[in-house]
Design a protein with these regions (language model features):
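Bacterial N-terminal signal peptides that target proteins for export
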Residues: 4-15
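Bacterial N-terminal signal peptides
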Residues: 15-22
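C-terminal motif of bacterial Sec signal peptides marking the signal peptidase cleavage site
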Residues: 25-26
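Central antiparallel beta-sheet cores of small beta-barrel/beta-sandwich binding domains
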Residues: 31-106, 137, 141
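Beta-strand-rich cores of mature extracytoplasmic or soluble domains
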Residues: 104, 113-128
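C-terminal partner/receptor-binding element of secreted or periplasmic proteins
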Residues: 124-149
Length: 149
């Protein structure tokens, strides 16, 4: 009888530990989620801009435009690039491949409070030295006007 009692307490202890770890995991995942209000709007750096609007079902409409400025003997010059499409978002991170971009193009957008941290891998076809990578600041919460609409 004593052995059964000890065994039941041991099982209850492990069940409680398992339940507690599940709760912590769920809470940790939910802390990373962002709302539509947090992602919607216009985000800018000195030379680049993202327009973002939540479409629902973990999808975002995205439009990027960027500029790479450089000097030439004739004076200042610039390369411009843009891309648009639909991204998928999970938690606080969206993955975006602009329509018509090379297959290896991958743009990752991580929403961290008032900042948007963007990384780019692969060739995305924006133009020589034009990149989406950088840390963006939100400049508007309003629904952006998308060129594709």
């Amino acid at each position: 009888m004593l052995r059964d009692s000890t065994m039941r307490r041991t099982w209850k202890f492990w069940a409680l530990c398992l339940a507690a770890s599940s709760i912590v995991t769920v809470c940790a995942d939910s802390d990373k989620s962002v709302t539509a209000a947090q992602v919607n709007g216009t985000w800018k750096t000195k030379h680049s801009e993202f327009k973002i609007w939540a479409l629902g079902q973990l999808r975002l409409q995205i439009e990027f435009s960027g500029v790479y400025e450089y000097k030439t003997p004739q004076g200042p010059s610039a390369n411009e690039g843009e891309g648009s499409g639909v991204a998928t978002i999970e938690g606080d991170t969206a993955i975006f491949k602009p329509e018509g971009a090379e297959e290896e193009c991958r743009i990752t957008l991580k929403f961290t409070g008032a900042k948007l941290v963007v990384t780019q891998t692969g060739i995305c076809g924006f133009g020589h030295n034009v990149s989406a990578a950088g840390t963006y600041k939100k400049v508007s919460d309003m629904k952006p006007k998308f060129e594709s609409n």
